[in-house]
Amino acid sequence: MTRDGDNSELNQIKSKIQEHLVSSGNYELISKQLKLQLIESGWYDKVAQIAMDELNNSSSKDTKDGGRAYTTKSLSDLYTVVKPKAEGLVPNEVRENMLKRIELYLDDLIE
C-alpha cells in the first residue's frame, strides 16, 4: 500500500474511533477529566500568564492617538506563540493519566 493509502486508512480509523468516543459519551468524560486535572495543576493560570506576558511584551511603542502598537496583532499570532509553550507545560502526570485512560478505552473497544 502507498504512503497516501496508509494515511487515508489511518485517518478513517481515527475518524471511527473519534465518532465512537463521542457517541459513547467517553469523549466528554475524558475531556472533563483533562480539564479538571489541568485546573488542579495550575496549568490554566500559567498559560494565561504566558498570554498576558506576550501581550504586554509585544507592545512596541505608543501610537499618535495615545494607544499602543502591538507586534501580536491577532488572536492567531498570540495562539502561534502560546500554543507550544502551553503544550510543554502540561504536567507529565496529566499526560500519563490521559494516555492510560485512552488506552483503556481502546482496549475495551477492541475486545
UniProtKB/Swiss-Prot annotation:
PANTHER family, per the entry: ENHANCER OF YELLOW 2 TRANSCRIPTION FACTOR
Subunit structure: Component of the nuclear pore complex (NPC)-associated TREX-2 complex (transcription and export complex 2), composed of at least SUS1, SAC3, THP1, SEM1, and CDC31. TREX-2 contains 2 SUS1 chains. The TREX-2 complex interacts with the nucleoporin NUP1. Component of the 1.8 MDa SAGA transcription coactivator-HAT complex. SAGA is built of 5 distinct domains with specialized functions. Within the SAGA complex, SUS1, SGF11, SGF73 and UBP8 form an additional subcomplex of SAGA called the DUB module (deubiquitination module). Interacts directly with THP1, SAC3, SGF11, and with the RNA polymerase II.
GO CC annotation terms, alphabetical: DUBm complex; nuclear pore; nucleoplasm; P-body; SAGA complex; transcription export complex 2
Keyword list, A-Z: Activator, Chromatin regulator, Cytoplasm, mRNA transport, Nucleus, Protein transport, Transcription, Transcription regulation, Translocation, Transport
Alphabetical list of Pfam families matching this protein: EnY2
Domain of life the protein comes from: Eukaryota
Cellular compartment(s): Nucleus, Nucleoplasm; Cytoplasm, P-body
Listed HAMAP family: ENY2_Sus1
Protein name per Swiss-Prot or TrEMBL: Transcription and mRNA export factor SUS1
Signal peptide bounds: none
GO biological process: chromatin organization; mRNA export from nucleus; protein transport; transcription elongation by RNA polymerase II
Gene that encodes it: SUS1
Coiled-coil segments on the chain, per record: none
An annotated Gene Ontology molecular function: transcription coactivator activity
Function: Involved in mRNA export coupled transcription activation by association with both the TREX-2 and the SAGA complexes. At the promoters, SAGA is required for recruitment of the basal transcription machinery. It influences RNA polymerase II transcriptional activity through different activities such as TBP interaction and promoter selectivity, interaction with transcription activators, and chromatin modification through histone acetylation and deubiquitination.
Similarity section: Belongs to the ENY2 family.
